[in-house]
């Protein structure tokens, strides 16, 4: 097995908190210098690199003299604001040693959920890469709330991979890669060298392995790889403790776990529908509707909906689930939740009688839906 990084021209590298901080107590400047050197080597080989880096909150806590990470949202946001200054300064200094410029990009889920802002972010990042700049991306913790948070930088890394249509995502952690079970609890766990990113068995294997410094366990990395695969990107989960890990991956050396994309690349708008929108509710489908969407990619008609969950407006994103609760698709609805409850199980010709008007014959048109 050879690493896919060797043949990848555009790469997103996510570096976890434990790899850039002193056990969560401020930034490890030597570690940042090392990552700058590694990325500079990839750049020397002609690769475009985006770096997704944690560390702002840990640095903020250090600067504010807090020995214990706070639990309050506003205290965490304050720490992020203070720490982001240090993170930017440290990376700017580290990359300057290799003749490279950096750019700071702070994102929230809301930025990518809005189609116009999504396209603007893609254009900006593409321009920076073409200017030979290294974009350094982090979640905008200072303003992010639970409704607009990505939740972890593994997810952010995958969404950025989709956004810029990168060839590969490298998730560097303090673990060797993916095992059949948590090796810290199961010494006989088998190491997984390669698998398909969409293999559902991976989620069962992932468990909750993860360091105490960041917010992401191994399960978030599996889900990130699944998201990245929708744009055709492979994911490598590897230990950031490995010497010269990025250079060796670029040489083709098999390090860590490689999760390959087994499905065809989704169209850009379908990727946006699949991963960048917050879900406002759920539609429960009957067996016929679920089968039609899975096998033929049809639009969803009201007659195929057996129940409506949540409160949503026209144009918001909802999940479509089958009788077993498995997500079949997600899409943008043509009717609000109140309207949907009035027209569910009804044929198209009965919509006007139920509502007094008809907006569209479909509850979700196939052009605004992505099958999962």
From Swiss-Prot:
Note the PROSITE patterns from the entry: GLUTAMATE_5_KINASE, PUA
- Tell me, in one coarse class, where this protein mainly resides: cytoplasm
Mention any Pfam family matching this sequence. Answer: AA_kinase
Major enzyme class:
transferase
Named in its record, the pathway it takes part in is: Amino-acid biosynthesis; L-proline biosynthesis; L-glutamate 5-semialdehyde from L-glutamate: step 1/2
Q: Report the record's Gene Ontology biological process terms.
A: L-proline biosynthetic process
Its Gene Ontology cellular component terms are: cytosol
The catalytic activity, as recorded, is: L-glutamate + ATP = L-glutamyl 5-phosphate + ADP
Function of the molecule: Catalyzes the transfer of a phosphate group to glutamate to form L-glutamate 5-phosphate.
UniProt keyword NAD, yes or no? no
Q: Which GO terms describe its molecular function?
A: ATP binding; glutamate 5-kinase activity; RNA binding
Q: Which residues bind ATP?
A: 14, 173-174, 215-221
Source organism (scientific name): Chromobacterium violaceum (strain ATCC 12472 / DSM 30191 / JCM 1249 / CCUG 213 / NBRC 12614 / NCIMB 9131 / NCTC 9757 / MK)
Give residues annotated as binding substrate: 54, 141, 153
Please provide the record's keywords in A-Z order: Amino-acid biosynthesis, ATP-binding, Cytoplasm, Kinase, Nucleotide-binding, Proline biosynthesis, Transferase
User: Under which name does UniProt file this protein?
Assistant: Glutamate 5-kinase
Localisation per UniProt entry: Cytoplasm
| Sequence similarity | Belongs to the glutamate 5-kinase family.
